[in-house]
Amino acid sequence: MVRDYNAALRFVNDYFTMDFRKFINQYFREERRAQIDQNITPAKYNKLFGELSNRQCEIIDDKESKYIVVAAGPGSGKTRVLVHKLASLLLLEDVKHEQLLMLTFSRAAATEFKKRLIDLVGNAAHYVDIKTFHSYSFDLVGKQGSLDEAKDVVRLAAEMIENGEVEASKIAKSVLVIDEAQDMGEDDFRLVQALMRQNEEMRVIAVGDDDQNIYGFRGSNSKYMQSLVEQDGAKLYEMTDNYRSAKAIVDCANRYVQRIPGRLKHTSIQSATGKDGKVMTLKSLLDAEIKVEGSTAILTRTNEETMQVAYELEQRGLHATVAQSMGGFRFGNLAEVRYFLKQLGGKDDVTITKEKWNEAKQRTFETYASSTCLNIMQHFISDFEITHQSYYRSDLREYIFESKIEDFIAADERSVFVSTIHKAKGREFDNVYLMSAIPDGRSVDDMRSYYVGLTRAKRNLYLVTNPQTECSSVSLPLNMKDVWLDFFRGIKEHVLHLRSGDNLQYKDGYLMNEQDINVAALSASGKDKLKAWTDKGYEVVSVRVSYTLAWKPQDSNIEYAVCLANLHLAKQEKTSE
């Protein structure tokens, strides 16, 4: 470009005197002009947009629409689009991090978005607010919540904004991003509307799949996502290329989803994998030869079915990873979590030093080395470390409060992942066995739940049409209602010596450790649950600790330790007289 001395002088003079756009047009070719306009290096630009589809790029390039609503089909890259849109807002549109807010419905989703954004834009991601509706609402209300308060905190936050009771700087936003928009309920949408009224120029980007709205039982309704589409200045995008599932699986899901009424999407999902795949029907799981080739999942409707399947797999010599129910307790009540917090000490300290953190982590891993919950603790601590530059106690408390055990249970190719359909939402597997009869159409929630199950599969889908086949053995998980809680008041030390996965013995309604000391007793509910099986000819053949927990009675300030367990039962053969 600069071939001689005079040209160099002219270039410098024009740089300082000429209109910037005219200067760029005169001295740079079209491709280079586009790169200069990007305000980032070509390598960074390629990382952001190089592997995105045309539709995904179209959504990210949309800088004009005040309301962007994306109806994203399964496997269409919803998470990728949202993360790259966040990166684009920060790097290409110069949206300041304090002006950007992303709301999700789970701590696991918030963590995943934060991790991916860190990978894309580096440390700048730490300053972006990616929060659940509940945690953001607690921030506005001005206190950390309890379980009871969490039920109404979103409504309360919306009311406070409407009444002008929230400091303006806390709610001054130029962009609001909503994940899983189909899951919004009345209070959630009221909060969104309050923010929209407070920030008249605020852009809203909402992504979701109305076909996967499976939380109607708690008030979610995709009509609120539809309401955003009807706003002036709204643009609806459909993402219908499925990069997850093979053609046979997508075709099967498409035929089924047509039965669901009131759908937002008008375009059928298309497989973009280039693979045929396979869909097969099985009468019973007992008929299946389950091979762990790639990631494999067995999805059920209930937690009880999950435990029965897991035990059946163990009897076949297959390892099962179970997304088990929390059984009526909070993640923060786990003995492993309580031990870690105790090792951190200094409850009044605002921050936790890295040295203290690492010491507490090491002691916890050593003390609970034999616990089957060790992997859960490792994932929990690792995720917090990745998403937090500094360790603030308030952040840790919030993180624990919003977390669930299943958030930290990872599927791998060495075991079969066993879960309810609800807990498998957002996951994907090479092979899926769907343990559910096809819904009869009377419940739209059931129909959508079945659709979620269908669309978890990547290569092979097995539809088990008669999942209620009687098994020779079953697993009976005990929850907080199934154990006699007052029994634990005098045996705290014995319970704290237990580890998840330890073997126990069952005798006359009591669970005993290796020293024949009673460490748990069944409640009336637990005895009734067990009797329902023993009346069918089943007997308890083994017992394994599932969790040890902290429990505080309503009439006491003292915490006690509770043991929950899985009872394994086998059908006894009738002897001929």
Where are these regions (language model features)?
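P-loop NTPase Walker
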Residues: 1-145
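Conserved helicase/translocase P-loop NTPase motor core
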Residues: 51-67, 84, 129-174, 184-195, ...
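Conserved helicase motor core of SF1/SF2 NTP-dependent helicases
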Residues: 74-79, 84, 107, 175, ...
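Structural recognition of the conserved hydrophobic beta-strand(s) that form the central parallel beta-sheet
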Residues: 102, 130, 203-209, 462-463
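Core RecA-like ATPase module of SF1/SF2 helicases and allied nucleic-acid translocases
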Residues: 107, 247-250, 299-449, 454-462, ...
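Charge-dense polyanion-binding interfaces
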Residues: 155-163, 320-356, 536-574
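Conserved interdomain hinge at the start of the Helicase C-terminal
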Residues: 281-294
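Conserved active-site motif detector
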Residues: 468-577
